[in-house]
Amino acid sequence: MTRISLPTTISAAPVAAQPLLEGVNKLLGSVPNLFRLTANSPAALEGYLGLNGALAKGALDAQTRERIALAVAQINGCNYCLSAHTYLGKNLAKLDDAEIAANRNGGSTDAKADVAVGFAVALVQKRGQVSDADVQAVKEAGYSEAELVEIVAHVALNTLTNYLNEAFGTPIDFPVVSAAAA
């Protein structure tokens, strides 16, 4: 049970959020509960969708974005996001079970991606206070400065959704995955 309203239909959401939810519905074919919950603040929904959309056009590929989302959700204990990104990782990014397990454990089966995921984990654990060596390792793995910035942005974006879902008890509307099961 959520702690705040979860509009059951697009028309039940605040008027300013309705066109944003229509866009989500058009893109995904449905409106997952995360978006319904965030629609309580049209400004927050617009900000989330804007950053998410911009980063989707960035330098990091979909696989790396999903790997980061899984690692961050695991650290933050967000079952909603673990469930969503396990589903998206398998079905859209084509990550296999071994890769998803590695991501949830803070790494990757791919050597280059392992460095990016490890950096994302360091960002969360150190609250952004990473070392010169942390940054240098990502550069040496072949990531550009644009990709470095995007890793930080993805950590922030995923932390936002983790906190929204955990703070307000968003009902999981994906096949359920538990943080305790990593």
Predicted regions and their residues:
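Hydrophobic alpha-helical segments
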Residues: 1-182
